[in-house]
């Protein structure tokens, strides 16, 4: 056909191989800005994956902040309520234990990020007890109960002694047998009385030169409640802390006040069982013979006459630096049924001086700490990392339930509180714990007489409480 121009095959191939020019504004081209082109498929896929990952993290973090703010707003009215100067706020006791094979900081993050914020907004006071070694929380709880028993017994003995002194015959005897004290003894008694009665309110603050306000006694809010269940509270962060708390309550209420005598073989077994299993296994240390061979040339150069002094001092330094194992339990779980409940702990038990209800009367809250370990658990770790908001809501809701006191009696099934955490425990750690008779891997046992005094905080009752608040 006339007028039709056909390109040679070589020129067609060159035109097809050249890339199409992107969009370019004439003004941009005049300024030297290159043409805008869309990235290739590979770059699009890369930025899509990176953007989705970052967006998932940002969304999850934002939801966590929203959840914490929501549950903090539910208890904010209690923190803004009026409180007298002579009244101390409600006080909680928090026991924190690390997950197996990890550090204590893992559990402390749960406390700081989710639980502490809600308690702070509610205006509650708290005491945090942390420990990495197994058995220390159990001993601490048992010792608090035993000390309460000692104080109650001492108060009863002092009351009986005061009643005996009021009798006229005893007063005549004391007057007849009394001895005249020297001036030094009287001065010592006056000094001790001054130290016992001295407070900084006599010198500082608004109490200075204000006798009525200074003499006013300060009371704990927990001591003024009629029902001991509504006083204070106990929070166990971690399944291990909960197991030790239950064991410590049984040991303190059923066991003796003084430690039992142990056989010579028992301390070795108990120290091995109480060894810290929460940390990763340490590297094997070189033997004493290898250390002696390694230090032999240096000792020959510096002090050839005393080659054994350094070798004998090294074990002593190591033994002094090593922490002592926690004391062994006074009673074993198999002995619960054969032991009698202490007479001091019958009925409404309160401290003689502070009038605060006993620890086992206060409501209990358990917060599990899920923690996966191992390379094969990577997919589950990634899923939990992007869905942390669900765990945050569980923790914040439980903390709000503790503040609002949604309490119910303790049931035998409540021994399984936080048992889902044990599914994440490393198998190797569990096997080693069974060989060493660890407290955490043993079945949790309880006595009906002890758990009858316990109460738990149930976050599931929050819905009923919210409905009641809406109706009112």
From Swiss-Prot:
Residue span of region Disordered: 1-20, 276-336
Compositional bias ranges of the Low complexity kind: 279-292
Annotated source species: Eremothecium gossypii (strain ATCC 10895 / CBS 109.51 / FGSC 9923 / NRRL Y-1056) (Yeast)
Side Mitochondrial intermembrane, residues: 59-472
Upper taxonomic lineage: Eukaryota, Fungi, Dikarya, Ascomycota, Saccharomycotina
One of the protein's GO biological processes: protein insertion into mitochondrial inner membrane
GO cellular component: cytoplasm; intracellular membrane-bounded organelle; membrane; TIM22 mitochondrial import inner membrane insertion complex
Record-annotated membrane-spanning stretches: 38-58
Pfam family membership, one: Tim54
Ranges of Basic and acidic residues composition bias in the record: 1-14
Role according to the record: Essential component of the TIM22 complex, a complex that mediates the import and insertion of multi-pass transmembrane proteins into the mitochondrial inner membrane. The TIM22 complex forms a twin-pore translocase that uses the membrane potential as external driving force.
Mitochondrial matrix topology ranges: 1-37
Oligomeric and partner information: Component of the TIM22 complex, whose core is composed of TIM22 and TIM54, associated with the 70 kDa heterohexamer composed of TIM9 and TIM10 (or TIM8 and TIM13).
The protein, known as: Mitochondrial import inner membrane translocase subunit TIM54
Superkingdom of the source species: Eukaryota
Location of this chain's protein in the cell: Mitochondrion inner membrane
